[in-house]
Amino acid sequence: MHCPFCQHNDTRVIDSRVSEDGTTIRRRRECEACGERFSTLETIELKLPTVVKSDGGREAFDARKLRTSFDRALQKRPVSEEQIEAAVRAVVHQLRMSGEREVGSLRVGEYVMVELRKLDHVGYVRFASVYRSFQDVADFREEIEKLERELPVGSEQLPLLEAALERAGKPGKR
């Protein structure tokens, strides 16, 4: 590494310390030529893939755009900032772990939908309506019905079912 004081390219490491979170190493160095000391930081560089848009254009992955997508889908929904940040991190992690240099915007959208589905079903349907270009109410209905079919029936749903059966004149099971 070049010395920032005399530009000589021989320096030696005097001390190395790993940061608390284990993602950075601080190295104390000394120049062999002038004797000056300086510090460097070493971090892991994991490059995110380039996003290939549906029109064929390419752009660098932008985590802010990803966050904006989550924010729009979850606007006025009971989802915390921490939950949204965790979902963004999960998508970024998936992209990093893909090991690919390029990823289609459709795949990024699928990753987002997986995370939204875990967080909030209304947010999921909002995002799906834009992502899948819903044309009419039937498209919404179809997506909601698909979501309902895939959801496990929870114990909190049984009282609603019983109440509906009673209103219809059929005795509910107790």
UniProtKB/Swiss-Prot annotation:
The keyword Transit peptide does not apply. A zinc finger (unnamed) spans 3-34. Binds 1 zinc ion. Residues 49-139 form the ATP-cone domain. Pfam families: ATP-cone, Zn_ribbon_NrdR. Its cofactor is Zn(2+). Belongs to the NrdR family. Negatively regulates transcription of bacterial ribonucleotide reductase nrd genes and operons by binding to NrdR-boxes. This is Transcriptional repressor NrdR. The gene is nrdR.
